[in-house]
Structures are given as structure tokens and as C-alpha cells.
Amino acid sequence: AELKAEWAKEDATLASFKDTKHSQYGGDLSRKGKATGYFHVEKKKGKWWFVAPDGYLFLSISANGISPGGGGSIRNPLKGLYTDKAPEGFVAPQLPVMNRPQTAPQGAPQGMMRPQQPDKYIYLTAWNNFRRFGTENVQAKANQLVVDRMNYWGMNTIGNWSSRDVIALGKKPFMVSLSGLGINNGILGMPDVYEEGFAASVDEGIRRSVEPYIGNKMLIGYFVGNEPTWSNIELRLCELIMEADDARPLKKALVSYLQKNGDTDQARIAFVYETYEKFLSAVSTSLKKYDPNHLNLGIRYGSGVPSQEVLALSKKYFDVYSFNNYGLQPNLANMDIIYKATGMPMIIGEYHFGTTDRGLGESLVRVTSQKDRGVAYRNYTEKAFSHPALIGTSWFTWYDQPLFGRGDGENYNIGLLDATDRPYEWMVKAIQAVSENCYDVHSGKKAPFDQIPERAGGTFPDFWE
């Protein structure tokens, strides 16, 4: 009864909210750029901006994994520990799988859909949709709740790995990943561009990826990949290529290159960049062919600064430079280095803060309370938007991870919502404050929020790196 009362209170709050400050695409009605009919980027008075299709300036405030029901967890990790049953009529959600070369099945396309596995996964958050809405039109009601929450919170963009049903409502701008690019079949995330038919395969993958979105004015753009492992360890990549099967085209190409240019560290690194450019060129050519109206949001690099050669290639082929940056603060010094080399607008694709006070893991960046999660979010996000190139941030992730862990066991307190489908109050307040202030912060009219969380524990090692 207490939980249903809280849900009802939230429903009433959401129903009474009206947004009068933003256009239908989420742009700031007080700031104008050029209307082109699609999202694009513009530099005005030394600051980069997204510009919405109707011409209003737009800063993207987003979260990854936005969905009406989370991702599920492994059933009964300890035999007999969990015996609850799914509500009658429940259908397991199909959610995009994060593309990590270390875990994706061999040959799996980037952004593939996880199959329904009701016998393996416990979908606690999705079950709550049935408890909240009953069985009539439950999915439609749950999808609309996502949009209503985004409106009230001030979150204007559906981030990566999110529900296609929510995207299909056509009520919020969104970003998606391209599929079928050969990344998962590569080595350390470097595709084998020398494989017979590689360009044709990429072309077909992109054609299929963009087909549902051509002409969709809510789409901001496409990501090409996520955290390429080989970046800044190019020599290690070459070692692994040389250890591969002799029949592998990528190895044959490296051996041939070194025979012609000498087997030196410089030659090996040069081969990596030449290979990477072949990949980026193939992707760029096909993307422009099939969908020239939407942005190439690039590969979300890791937290460090890639080499100058990689930065130059990013400038050549991407419209926006994207990177993930876990830390108590955005790394403005690194952003300055990247901006000096590329002059490009930027997106932070992942960051988060967590704590242990809900019985979950602390996350990659630890603070000591739910209040401090909100403080950390506002501090980080407004400081990020104070950079002249930063035009978007995407929190990771929408829901807390399950207590028993997602597929790889990760169980962090990193959600905007908990397992009982209740928003974290301090996070909501922080997002609302960022939404209210970010345009003035970015334009230089207002200083970013400078309070920092008390006794924050710093950064936990990221074992994905």
C-alpha cells in the first residue's frame, strides 16, 4: 500500500507538469540558431551547440539505458534464494545489449537485442509495471511514464542502449548506435578491414541500422562504437594480431606492411592508424550515402586522451567527438587537449556516482549518500557544460542494476530509479537544476555549481579498461 501510494503521488505530480520553456524538440525557446529540419551543430560566439530541427539551441541531457523496466538479473544465483514469480501476463523485455568485444557473442552485431529469457532472468523492475498499471495497456502506460518523467526532470534526450518502444513514441530526441560494423569480430575492438567483403558488410550493416530512422527528426545522430580497447595500447594490439592465426587477413596485412616498411614500433603504430582510417572511411561513406541528414557522433572513447593521430582521424570523419569520463569531476584539462587538436563539439557518453546505502555496489565513482549523488551530479554536469565544446552529457544508467547483478555480475547503485520504480529524489532535483542552468552556464552568463560531495571515496578501478 505504501509503495502504491508513492506511485500515485508521482503520477499526480507528473500529470500537473507543463513545460513552457522548450520547443517540441527540446530546444531552448530563448536561443536561436539556423533551422535546417534536422539536428546539427553550430558554433556561436565561441561556443558549440546542438541546434534542434526548428532552429532552437539544444544541450543534450541524457541517460543510457532508458526503458520502462530495466535489464533483468540472473535467476537464483544461489540455489533457491529467489522464489518469486512473474506477474500473470508478463512478457520479458527485449533490451539492447551493450557492445563490449570482451563479452559479446562471436559475430553478434553491435547493439543487438537480448533475447527473451524468462527462465534465466528476473525482471524485477519490469514486473513492477504490472503491479503499478495492472494488465490493460501496461506497456503503453509504462512507456508514457518514461516520457513524463523525462519531461518533469528536465532530461531531453534518450541515450544509448535505450528502449526502442520509448523511442518509437516520437516524443523525445534520441541517439542510437550503428550495428554490423565488424567491431566484435576484431581484435581489441579493431575490425578486420582486410577481410574479403568487409566494406560491403559494413555498408549493409549501416543500411539496416539507419533504415528505421531516415527522415526521423527526433534522431540526433549515430554512435559508431564504444571504448575501443586498442586506443593508447597500439603496440599491444599489434602483438595480439601477430599471435593470431596466419590465415587471418588482419595479420597478413600487418606482416606485409612490416615487410615493406620495416618492423619497428613506429611502423606498427602507423599500421594501426592506417587500419583505423580504413574502418572510419568505410563507415563514413556508407552513413553519408544512406542517411546524410543525421550526425555521426563518433566512437565513445575512454577517459584518456587518444594519440594526436587518432584525434586527427576523429576530426576528419566525425561530426561530434564523444568520450566516456568516470570521475568526481569532468576532466576539463583533457577536454582542452582534445579541443585544441580537433576544434570539435563534444559529448560525454557515460559517467555516474553511487553509494552503498541501498545495499548495492558503490559504482565506479563512490560518494557517501543519496544526497551526495545529487550534489556530485550537478557539480560534474554543470562544470562539463562550462566547457565551450561540451554539448551533451549522458548518465549511466536509468535504473539501478539488480541486486543479484546483471549478466556479468555488476550490481551498482547508479540508477535514477530504484528496483521498486521510485525516483531518487536528490538525483531528480539535481537534474532539474542542471536543466534550468546549463544554457546560462554554457553561454558564460552563470558560473557552474561548485559544491562538491563530502567525503567522496574516489574512483573504483574500471575492469572494462
Residue map of PLM features:
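Aromatic- and acidic-residue-enriched segments that line the glycan-binding/catalytic groove
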Residues: 66-81, 169-184, 217, 224-260, ...
